[in-house]
A protein has these predicted regions:
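Divalent metal-dependent hydrolysis catalytic cores, especially in the metallo-beta-lactamase
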Residues: 1-45, 67-68
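Divalent metal-binding pocket/active-site signature
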Residues: 10, 58-145
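A short acidic, helix-capping loop that chelates divalent metal ions and anchors anionic groups
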Residues: 42-47, 75-81, 179-181
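Glycine-rich anion/phosphate-binding loops
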Residues: 46-56
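Conserved small/polar residues in nucleotide/adenosyl-binding loops
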Residues: 185-192
Length: 197
């Protein structure tokens, strides 16, 4: 069984965790048998999250079909809100992850040091899955050493694949139109890349 750990494709998506856009999707209706995640993306932190929105998010995440929090995280590319707001929103989602005992799917752009600092300070017990990872092996090792899992999608640094232990490596389609099977079976394996060197 292969699980697509993070996709934005509309349900139904068998063997996939569908990320719903919590802030914009006010008419959410679950598809039977579908797995979901929900959270507040750092790009949606340009304003304060209302108490009603936090309540609604927690109610969704308490449902059994919601198997993960996120995608949430920190984006220092300039697309997210002010850093203090991103941190406040992400910390609240970390609290939900811990209290509900569900993993958190993390959006991390130019923020590896920030994430590692949060892990060191907060000592979370639930898995952190860094989604859509495209960086070099050194950045992967930094996050792996902090205890994170790494999820690769359609675009990734092939050298990074060597740095990720199999038991910490996940796959995702994210916004790709390709299926998870197509992504996995058309990407070069570490063994194939070693032969080509």
């Amino acid at each position: 069984m292969i699980l697509d750990i993070h996709t934005h494709k509309a349900a139904p998506q068998p063997l996939a965790v569908v990320d719903i856009s919590f802030i914009t999707n006010h008419e959410f209706k679950a598809v039977d048998g579908q797995l979901y995640s929900a959270g507040i993306h750092p790009w949606d932190t340009h304003r304060d999250v209302t108490p009603e929105e936090w309540t609604r998010l927690e109610e969704l995440l308490c449902r059994p079909e919601f198997v993960a929090i996120g995608e949430g995280g920190i984006d220092l590319s300039g697309r997210g809100g002010m850093m203090f707001r991103q941190l406040n929103v992400f910390k609240r989602q970390i609290e939900l992850s811990e209290s509900l005992k569900k993993p958190i799917i993390v959006h991390c752009v130019k923020a590896e040091d920030v994430l590692c600092g949060l892990i060191r300070d907060l000592k979370p017990t639930q898995p952190w899955i860094i989604h859509g990872f495209r960086k070099k092996p050194q950045a992967a090792r930094q996050l792996l050493n902090a205890g994170c899992y790494i999820s690769l999608g359609q675009h990734f640094n092939p050298d990074t694949l060597h740095a990720i232990p199999q038991d910490r490596l996940l796959a995702e389609t994210d916004e790709s139109e390709l299926s998870i099977h197509c992504l996995l079976y058309t990407s070069p394996s570490p063994r194939d890349r070693q032969k080509s060197r």
